[in-house]
Amino acid sequence: MALPDDTRLMNNQTSIEGNSAPDRMALPSRPPPPTASNEPPEHESTGPVDEAASKSESGLSPNSKKAGHAAQSPSGRKKSPKIQNAQPAQSPAETVGVVNVATLGLVPSVQGHAGQVCSNCGTTHTPLWRRSPQGAIICNACGLYLKARNAARPANIRRPPSVMASNVRQAAAKLSPKKATAPLLPSNPGATYVAADQTPSGSCPGGGRCNGTGGAEGCGGCPAYNNRVSKSASLNVLKCQGAAAASSKKPQAAEGSGEEPTEMDITALHVQSQNTTVVIACQNCGTTITPLWRRDEAGHTICNACGLYYKLHGVHRPVTMKKAIIKRRKRVIPAAGGDAEIEPSEAPDSPPATSEPPMEKGTVNEDGSVNLGIRRRSVRPLTLVPEDELRRNRQASPLSSAALGQYHSSHTNQPHHGAHASLTYENRLAPIHSLALPVDRQASISPASFLSPSRKRSISAVENEPSSHNDNESHKRLSSIKSILNPMPSSEIHREVSPADQLRMQPASRSPAMSSLTPAHSPGSFSNSTVIGTPTSAPILRSASRDTHNDSERMKAERRAALEREAEMMRELLAAKERELAELGYD
């Protein structure tokens, strides 16, 4: 079997070196005498470094050992620069301490963001790193400020200007091997830390009253509860990391050779070893529960209530206004659908629900929320005239039996539709001749007359009072065109009218339209009359017929004269308008 060329070359080199080894080997030199200098011997080394060096030398082949001895000459007792650089220059305690500090994230340069520093304000920690339009790395606050205002965020708007210098000094103190004390709390300038109170977790009452402990329905989305949990958790993690770093530095510093034991802060280690939960507290009122942490003008951490009070009034909120429980408003959400102002139970056809109390604006509900109020529609439709007044007018209307008989007899031939709304009692009109004729003109019923009864009465109402004894006679007189257009003077109305004249005037005073509907001498009208219903009234009827003819002629003459006067007035008005048109001219 033939060997490869590389293997044969290696074997030849080994044989040559084995034959020439005795000729090359130099005698070992004697160690130099100890000197009075304070420097340690060159070949002396302590700790695991010498052990590692010896292991590496023992692992070398004999040929490499011989080559190493040959490199040393009796006269030159100094090591080569290569070996001098390989020798460690610091103690093992320092080496391990630096690694632990960098691993635990206590140095800002390696704090979870690969040494990122905001190019604008210089901060090293932010929830989100952004980039400026020029490509520089900026923090979340500077990025949002630049996006909103299109200007660089001032460096001292949130933190004092000496923050960067203090961070550098703290980093140098952490790297120094002389001090093994870890920070008790993370460096957050302007923040106040207090021990969390011993309120049992999960004791939040809910219903808009939050104490930050959770446990109630809806606490998963409560900002006050989430804020408290996240802040306390992050502070506890950083505190435990600081305590672990300090405990790891202590035994390693004691193992160092030739070094004095470092000073330890026992109080800080004792406090850090305790399992105490710390939370951020408001600088103004000291509360630890808030849905949003804010900062004042000096950079101090304050709660949401104090921040809003300071922003509104310009002064810090008094401590007496602090409340142990955060009270949230509960807005009344209108019902989904077309009309949110009226509920299904409040339909106009359904009776009003009297058991449900009215929801007025400003009232407090059972769960402690403030009711903003809902405008409810009235169940009954609004009317201009109250129902009781209309009922009183219907009861007090003086309608005679003859008028009612004529009214019912005129509607006997019409078909009856009971379900139709136009035939209801409220929508039907009384006969014209049954209505009472006022002195001048009857005043219409207005809502103002019912709302303010103490107002001054009108002249027509005053004039109606002395003629109350003539109501029975006046309501029988029909409303003719003459009475509407030319009201009679009060002297003629108040004069004495005999019963015979009343009987003569009743059929004659009807208008032609009314006479066509109800004839003057129809059997129904005479049968319904209470005056001429007996056989002994025949002579009176004959005399009344003659008087009626004379009165009708007289009334026709009066009517003719009134129409002539109206025509003359219309002519004058027409002439005045024609003159005005003539003055304006034609186009």
Swiss-Prot record:
UniProt main location, coarse: nucleus
| Tree of life domain | Eukaryota
Q: Which SUPFAM superfamilies match?
A: Glucocorticoid receptor-like (DNA-binding domain)
Q: Which GO terms describe its molecular function?
A: DNA-binding transcription factor activity, RNA polymerase II-specific; RNA polymerase II cis-regulatory region sequence-specific DNA binding; zinc ion binding
Record's Pfam families? GATA (PF00320)
Q: Where are the zinc fingers (GATA-type)?
A: 118-142, 282-306
Bilayer-crossing residues are none
> What induces its synthesis?
The promoter contains a number of GATA sequences; however, expression occurs in a constitutive fashion and is not regulated by the concentration of iron available to the cells.
- One biological-process term from Gene Ontology? positive regulation of transcription by RNA polymerase II
Q: Which residues form a coiled coil?
A: 553-585
Mutation: C219S; reported impact is: Decreases DNA-binding and fails to exhibit iron-mediated regulation of siderophore synthesis
Q: Impact of mutating C210S?
A: Decreases DNA-binding and fails to exhibit iron-mediated regulation of siderophore synthesis
> Do the record's keywords include Transcription regulation?
yes
Bias (Basic and acidic residues): 466-476, 544-561
Where is this protein found? Answer: Nucleus
UniProt biased composition (Polar residues): 9-18, 55-64, 82-93, 508-537
Q: Where is this region: Cystein-rich region (CRR)?
A: 204-222
- Among the entry's GO cellular component annotations, what is one? nucleus
- Phenotype when the gene is knocked out: Derepresses siderophore biosynthesis in high iron concentrations.
Q: Where is this region: Disordered?
A: 1-94, 335-375, 448-561
> Keywords of this protein's UniProt record, alphabetized?
Coiled coil, Metal-binding, Nucleus, Repeat, Transcription, Transcription regulation, Zinc, Zinc-finger
Cite the domain annotation text. Answer: The conserved cystein-rich region (CRR) localized between the zinc fingers is also involved in DNA-binding and transcription repressor activity.
Functional note: GATA-type transcription repressor that regulates iron- acquisition genes through specific binding the GATA sequence elements of target promoters in a zinc-dependent manner. Iron acquisition regulation is critical for survival under both iron-limiting conditions (to acquire essential iron) and iron-replete conditions (to limit iron toxicity). Represses the synthesis of siderophores in high iron conditions.
List the protein's name: GATA-type transcription factor sre
Native source species? Neurospora crassa (strain ATCC 24698 / 74-OR23-1A / CBS 708.71 / DSM 1257 / FGSC 987)
